[in-house]
């Protein structure tokens, strides 16, 4: 790299799940230094923290911070933070399921802390794997929320940070195609943790998260060329 060329840096909000791992894989091809930030909020599927740590090493992130946000567990009752609240089955209505698994304020906290981290390391981009195409039950996964918080953070910190959500308008099949585009399909399939019940890889097979993941993979395997073509049309990938 020429001496006078600016180093491109980004912070990836990283859980070790399918979506954030796919975002990390892509970011590593686009930035010189990729910083990851993971949050420990007492989630019942907290095995994801160990998986996130391992994946950042395997994939080659520049740095990885694990931040204690246990206040979320105290304040936000959810089936993801309370053992006495049952994780709903995928057969239930998706919108009703989202009410149980929604952790109020989670992405507000995560993205704000990621912005502070970005400020410290002088990164101007934050990447988050939120998506509202397949499952729009969470209000803090909507594009208009991401844009609004981005504006508020920039005003509050007097620092120009750009929140990017590369998966926002991709369906799950296209997200699998993106992992395959970077030749990491097997890694994402076997080494990530998306399951609400904390089971790596294919997961429990019963929760909404596992169902969406499995259906997306099945669709991609049935129509790989069509799905890859759709991905490229949406993203501009060559």
Curated annotation (Swiss-Prot):
Keywords from the UniProt entry: ATP-binding, Ligase, Metal-binding, Nucleotide-binding, Queuosine biosynthesis, Zinc
Needed co-factor(s): Zn(2+)
Catalytic activity from the UniProt record: 7-carboxy-7-deazaguanine + NH4(+) + ATP = 7-cyano-7-deazaguanine + ADP + phosphate + H2O + H(+)
Cofactor binding comment, as recorded: Binds 1 zinc ion per subunit.
Keyword Nucleotide-binding part of the UniProt annotation: yes
Sites where the protein binds Zn(2+): 195, 204, 207, 210
Pfam families listed in its UniProt record: QueC
Domain of life: Bacteria
GO molecular function, one term: ATP binding
EC number from the UniProt entry: 6.3.4.20
Functional pathway: Purine metabolism; 7-cyano-7-deazaguanine biosynthesis
Biological-process GO terms, alphabetical: queuosine biosynthetic process
Binding site for ATP: 14-24
Family: Belongs to the QueC family.
NCBIfam families in UniProt: 7-cyano-7-deazaguanine synthase QueC, PRK11106.1
Function text: Catalyzes the ATP-dependent conversion of 7-carboxy-7-deazaguanine (CDG) to 7-cyano-7-deazaguanine (preQ(0)).
Protein name: 7-cyano-7-deazaguanine synthase
Gene: queC
């Amino acid at each position: 790299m020429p001496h006078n060329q600016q180093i491109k840096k980004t912070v990836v909000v990283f859980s070790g799940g399918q979506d954030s791992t796919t975002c990390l894989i892509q970011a590593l091809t686009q930035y010189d230094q990729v910083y990851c930030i993971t949050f420990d909020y007492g989630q019942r599927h907290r095995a994801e923290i160990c998986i996130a740590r391992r994946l950042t090493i395997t994939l080659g992130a520049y740095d990885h911070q694990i931040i204690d946000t246990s206040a979320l567990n105290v304040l936000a009752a959810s089936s993801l933070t309370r053992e006495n609240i049952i994780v709903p089955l995928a057969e239930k209505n998706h919108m009703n399921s989202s009410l149980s698994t929604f952790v109020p304020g989670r992405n507000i906290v995560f993205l704000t802390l990621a912005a502070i981290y970005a400020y410290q390391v002088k990164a101007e981009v934050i990447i988050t794997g939120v998506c509202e195409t397949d499952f729009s039950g969470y209000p803090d996964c909507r594009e208009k929320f991401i844009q609004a918080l981005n504006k508020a953070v920039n005003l509050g910190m007097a620092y120009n940070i750009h929140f990017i959500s590369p998966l926002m308008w991709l369906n799950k099949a296209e997200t699998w195609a993106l992992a395959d585009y970077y030749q990491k399909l097997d890694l994402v399939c076997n080494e990530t943790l998306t399951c609400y019940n904390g089971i790596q890889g294919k997961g429990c097979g019963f929760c909404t998260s596992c169902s969406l993941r499995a259906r997306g993979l099945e669709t991609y395997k049935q129509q790989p060329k069509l799905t890859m073509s759709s991905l490229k049309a949406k993203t501009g990938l060559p």
